[in-house]
C-alpha cells in the first residue's frame, strides 16, 4: 500500500466488531463508574455489556442493526444530564427525546466511520429513537431487552431511592412497554424476594 493511502474499511463480522469496539471506547470515558469484579468501569460501558448479554439470550441470531443498537443504547449518556431539563414529566420527556436523538447521531457517526451503508445506519438510528414501537418487532425486542436489563440489574438501586408507591408506578409503566414474551421472561428473572414481590404486586 502506498504512503498516504488509508486502510480499507472493515467488512462483515470485522466491521461489526470494530463498531462495538468504537462504541465501547466512546463509553469507557464516562465519569460515572461502578465497581465490577474489582475494577471501576464506566456505567455506560457496563450497561452496554448488559444489553448485549440480554439480547443474546432473548433473541439469539438477532439482526445486525438490532445488535448494534443494543450495544450503543446509552452511548455517552453522561453528556446530556437530567439536571439540564425542567423537573416534572414534561422535562423528563424532553430529556429522553433529546437523549434518543443524541444517541442516534453519535452512533451514526461511528457506524459511518467504520464503513456501514446509509440504510444500516438509518435502521440503527430508528431503533435508538424507538420509532414505531409495537409495530416494528425489532424496536419491540429492543424495548423488551431494555426493560429486562432494568429489572435485572437496576431495579434494586431504584428501590433504595423511591417509596413503594413510586416503585409500583415505575414497574407498571415498564410492564406496559413490554411484549407478552418480554413479560414472561421478566417473571423468570432471579430477583431478590422483596423485588419479586414488588413486581408481582405491580403487575398482578
Task: Please identify what each model-predicted range represents.
Residues 64-82, 87, 103, 107, ...:
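His-Asp-centered metal-binding catalytic motifs of divalent-metal-dependent phosphohydrolases/nucleases
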Residues 41-44, 93, 97-100, 164:
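Flexible, glycine- and charge-enriched loops at secondary-structure boundaries
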Residues 4-21, 25, 38-42, 49, ...:
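Divalent metal-dependent phosphate-bond-processing catalytic cores, especially two-metal-ion Mg2+/Mn2+ enzymes
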Residues 35-39, 90-96, 136-137:
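A ubiquitous short alpha-helical element
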Residues 83-126:
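Helix-adjacent hinge/juxtasegments
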Amino acid at each position: 500500500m502506498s504512503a498516504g493511502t488509508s486502510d480499507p474499511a472493515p467488512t462483515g463480522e470485522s466491521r461489526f466488531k470494530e463498531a462495538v469496539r468504537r462504541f465501547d471506547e466512546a463509553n469507557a470515558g464516562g465519569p460515572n463508574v461502578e465497581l465490577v469484579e474489582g475494577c471501576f468501569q464506566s456505567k455506560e460501558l457496563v450497561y452496554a455489556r448488559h444489553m448485549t448479554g440480554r439480547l443474546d439470550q432473548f433473541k439469539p441470531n438477532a439482526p445486525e442493526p438490532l445488535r448494534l443498537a443494543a450495544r450503543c443504547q446509552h452511548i455517552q449518556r453522561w453528556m446530556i444530564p437530567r439536571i439540564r431539563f425542567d423537573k416534572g414529566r414534561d422535562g423528563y420527556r424532553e430529556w429522553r427525546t433529546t437523549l434518543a436523538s443524541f444517541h442516534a447521531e453519535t452512533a451514526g457517526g461511528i457506524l459511518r466511520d467504520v464503513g456501514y451503508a446509509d440504510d444500516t445506519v438509518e435502521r440503527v438510528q430508528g431503533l435508538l429513537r424507538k420509532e414505531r414501537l409495537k409495530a416494528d418487532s425489532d424496536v419491540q425486542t429492543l424495548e423488551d431487552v431494555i426493560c429486562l436489563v432494568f429489572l435485572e440489574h437496576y431495579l434494586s438501586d431504584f428501590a433504595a431511592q423511591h417509596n413503594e408507591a413510586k416503585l409500583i408506578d415505575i414497574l407498571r409503566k415498564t410492564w406496559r412497554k413490554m411484549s407478552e414474551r418480554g413479560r414472561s421472561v421478566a417473571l423468570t428473572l432471579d430477583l431478590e424476594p422483596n423485588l419479586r414481590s414488588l413486581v408481582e404486586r405491580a403487575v398482578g
